[in-house]
Regions:
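Membrane-embedded alpha-helical bundles of multi-pass enzymes
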Residues: 1-191, 232, 382, 393-397, ...
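Soluble catalytic domains of enzymes that build or remodel membrane lipids, polysaccharides, and related
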Residues: 190-404
Length: 404
């Protein structure tokens, strides 16, 4: 299943693989359904999110066995959601096989994926809808969202098995799939939003500071100068954007640096969004943040468990003994934050994996006319994580009708 996602992009593969799952699901009892769906989901997630190993082992100093164990436990836990729903549906839902294939199984899969994204902190990563970003079904995303795209994939897969099991004639299945795809194609031709204001020119700055050096104190000045020089070389734009934690330090420790940047960019009337940490000097709490040098800031609301904070610290505090991730005791920002206004546009900002949650992006709409996501995917350098993240960002842009 992972091959259907970026960077492989064998998008067509999601249809026969879901059909294969539905075929075995249809033939078994409730316990068998649980096992089949759990194994299918486990395999998808083990191969799909194996990039977590890169951050834990190469950059977090974790023993390899511990890093692998974390990935296996996370994947196994996430796989329980669709498996449990499959068990309950198979045991208690008494309908004919055609309805099961076209309605019950797709609805069950959709419900399970939605549940994975909202339970505890949520981890809405390997969702089938992301495989269709360049396909006709993506036309449904601006109207119904990514989950609907995944549900329609499942309906098409169910129709394939219905034909194989002689529950539906091939021409009826072709009409059904044709209507789904044709409607998606038609919806994709519609522009659901209109331009607001003048076009703005944006420069994205990437300092390419190796992750293993980024947090070293001797690299601090070099990092600041690298970003300053790159910015001044590209200042003839409306907006410059730096990555997440481009400055690996607190805002209150670099005031002169930020002031000098604002002054240097004033003549060209350029705004700058900077990724760094902001510390509340009264409470001692600190936040993964983005600020505009011309005023305004955003503090990350949806934190990464085990990376930015330790959930259930009293129970799993031992985690800190096995892994060393810098700045991993961060606080979440308030829900009701004002939008940043940069280059004359209200901007919806997200940091790192916040953009995998469509509900988090939607709360800045419709006021935000532009979406900005800043990330430090160097934690996963050498893996396919950044390509998967890029596909997810494209889906958020498609859903919202905004550039990201």
């Amino acid at each position: 299943m992972t091959l259907a996602f970026a960077p492989f992009d064998w998008s067509w593969l999601v249809y026969p693989l879901l059909a294969y799952l539905f075929y075995h699901w249809l033939r078994t009892d409730a316990f068998g359904a649980f096992i089949h769906v759990w194994l299918f989901s486990l395999g998808m997630r083990l191969t799909g999110i194996c990039w977590i190993f890169f951050s834990l082992y190469f950059h977090g100093g974790s023993p390899a066995v511990f890093a692998v164990a974390i990935i296996v436990l996370l994947s196994a836990g996430l796989a329980l959601f669709p498996a449990t729903v499959a068990y309950l549906v198979t045991r208690y839902c008494r309908v004919n096989d055609l309805i099961r294939l076209l309605v019950v199984f797709p609805g069950t899969w959709l419900l399970a994926e939605w549940t994975v994204g909202i339970t505890l902190t949520g981890f809405a990563w390997m969702q089938p809808g992301y495989t269709q970003i360049d396909w006709p079904l993506a036309g449904y995303a601006p109207v119904f969202g990514n989950h609907a795209v995944g549900g329609l994939i499942a309906v098409c897969a169910g129709a394939l098995i219905a034909v194989m099991k002689n529950l539906m004639s091939w021409h009826k299945a072709l009409i059904l799939v044709g209507l789904i795809w044709g409607t998606g194609f038609a919806l994709k031709q519609i522009s659901w939003t209109e331009p607001a204001g003048e076009d703005i020119e944006v420069a994205l700055i990437q300092g390419n500071i190796p992750q293993e050096l980024k947090w070293k104190r001797h690299m601090h000045r070099s990092t600041l100068m690298t970003y300053r020089d790159l910015t001044l070389e590209n200042k003839d734009v409306d907006l410059v954007i730096w990555p997440e934690t481009a400055i690996p330090d607190y805002k209150h420790r670099v005031p002169a640096y930020l002031i000098s940047l604002r002054q240097a960019l004033r003549q060209s009337d350029t705004d700058l969004l900077v990724g760094l940490f902001i510390k509340d000097l009264d409470s001692g709490r600190y936040y993964n943040s983005v600020l505009s040098v011309n005023g305004g800031e955003y503090r990350k609301r949806h934190l990464v468990p085990l990376g930015e904070y330790i959930p259930l610290r009293s129970l799993i505090g031992f985690f800190n003994r096995w892994i060393d991730i810098p700045m991993s005791d961060i606080d979440s920002g308030p829900d009701d934050q004002a939008l940043l206004v940069v280059a004359g546009q209200p901007v919806g900002v997200s940091i790192c994996f916040e953009d995998i949650f469509s509900r988090d992006v939607r709360r800045d709409l419709p006021q935000a006319t532009v979406l900005v996501n800043v990330s430090n995917d160097a934690w996963f350098d050498g893996s396919h994580e950044s390509r998967q993240h890029h596909a997810i960002a494209r889906m958020r842009a498609l859903e919202s009708g905004r550039y990201m």
